């Protein structure tokens, strides 16, 4: 972990790519969290298999990026149930794109695929969007500003149906 500690001391943020459904996924996630001390986990939805690690991520407010469209290339599904479980636990899970040209989906397509397949509510989609800012490495003031923009949009938008 020495190289990572050196990077942090120089002001860099640490994230780890923890592929889904791999051999020893939980061990990889645990190492990223406990040994390396990441500030964010990319992919890593297998964390729902270990409540202690999920609780740790929630307590430490470690963000988790997910990429539903690319998940379906390496797994039987897009891991929507796991994403929803993480969201329900209060974990700062966000939806992102992952090499859009290769996996066929920019961020909007990833949101749409997840919302459509799992019948997400507006509140769930809004929370995922807020999580993307709250778990980012922008300043706290920028986070507040962007989250307020989301709140303002939602307050002024006439949603025609309860689900997106």
Each predicted region: which residue ranges?
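Histidine/acidic residue-rich metal-binding segments in metalloenzymes
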Residues: 1-16, 21-37, 48-62, 78-92, ...
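Active-site beta-loop-alpha junctions enriched in small/polar residues
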Residues: 17-23, 44-46, 67-71, 100
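Short secondary-structure capping/turn micro-motifs that flank functional sites
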Residues: 22-24, 48-50, 73-74, 102-104, ...
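Short, basic, glycine/proline-bearing loop/turn elements
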Residues: 36-40, 63-70
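Conserved, mostly hydrophobic/aromatic
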Residues: 41, 64, 98, 139
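Flexible, acidic glycine-rich loops studded with aromatic residues
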Residues: 76-132
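Mid-to-C-terminal alpha-helical segments outside catalytic/metal-binding sites
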Residues: 119-164
């Amino acid at each position: 972990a020495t190289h990572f500690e050196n990077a942090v001391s120089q002001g860099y943020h640490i994230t780890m790519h923890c592929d889904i459904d791999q051999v020893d996924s939980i061990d990889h996630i645990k190492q990223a969290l406990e040994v390396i001390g990441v500030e964010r986990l990319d992919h890593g939805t297998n964390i729902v298999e270990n409540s202690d690690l999920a609780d740790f991520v929630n307590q430490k407010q470690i963000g988790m990026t997910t990429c539903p469209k690319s998940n379906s290339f390496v797994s039987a599904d897009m891991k929507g149930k796991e994403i929803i479980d993480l969201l329900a636990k209060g974990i700062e899970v966000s939806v992102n794109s992952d090499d859009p040209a290769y996996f066929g989906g920019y961020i909007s397509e990833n949101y749409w695929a997840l919302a459509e397949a799992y019948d997400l509510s507006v509140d769930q989609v809004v929370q995922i969007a807020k999580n993307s800012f709250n778990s980012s490495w922008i300043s706290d003031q920028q986070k507040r500003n962007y989250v307020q923009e989301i709140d303002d949009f939602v307050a002024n938008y006439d949603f025609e149906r309860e689900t997106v």
